[in-house]
Amino acid sequence: EIGSGLVGSEMCIRDSLELFISLAKSAKQEGVMAIEKRANEIEDPFTRSTLAMVADGFSADFIYEVAESDIKQMEERHRAGALIFSQCGMYAPTLGVLGAVIGLIAALGNLSDIDKLGHSIAAAFVATLLGIFTGYVCWHPFANKLKRISAEEVEIKKMILEGALALQGNASSIAIEAKLQAFIPVSERKSMRD
């Protein structure tokens, strides 16, 4: 559904563009009630509430303030979630080194037993390797992916807000398409017209 998922944001952008072009045409022919009717059919809460404000006749300033506040709150939640994984990535190598120190202390306690000495040194190296591996191969990439997904979702919501404000200002479908094309990479704009 439009703007409902984090995966496949291009499809959400395409759907959003098509939605607002369609809404502008419907509003021109049927009036504001067409926007309200379509808003009730949309599953995405942000899109639905923003369009409901347009249909209810709220001012552009009010719609902008409410939607922008919603976007900022979402960004903060996403930032806090990504921060947890970033911190895990920072601490994992340190914990690996701590495991190495503990393994070496155990090795020093077993200097007389060669078999135990080898196992303790191996455990020390494994702890270091796991700490570095999880930090740089798991936690940091996951945090970066969350940040990228969040940025894409913010762009989609900003596009939806711009489309809603254009509808509120009675912009034509051509004007809305031109305005919302700014959210689409230039290389993909031609394919959007096909």
Residues of each region from the PLM?
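Acidic, Ser/Thr-rich low-complexity segments on the non-lumenal side of membrane proteins
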Residues: I13-P45, L165-K190
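C-terminal membrane-proximal segments flanking the terminal transmembrane helix
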Residues: M192-D194
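Helix-termination/interfacial motifs at the ends of transmembrane alpha-helices
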Residues: D70-I149
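A ubiquitous short alpha-helical element
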Residues: S9-E10, V32-K37, N144-S150
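Structured inter-helical modules in multipass membrane proteins
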Residues: F20-L98
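Single conserved hydrophobic/aromatic residue that forms the stacking wall/gate
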Residues: E1-G8, C12-I13
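Channel- or pocket-lining gating/hinge segments that regulate access to a cavity or pore
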Residues: K116-R189
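Solvent-exposed, amphipathic alpha-helical segments
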Residues: S16-S26, S49, M53, G103, ...
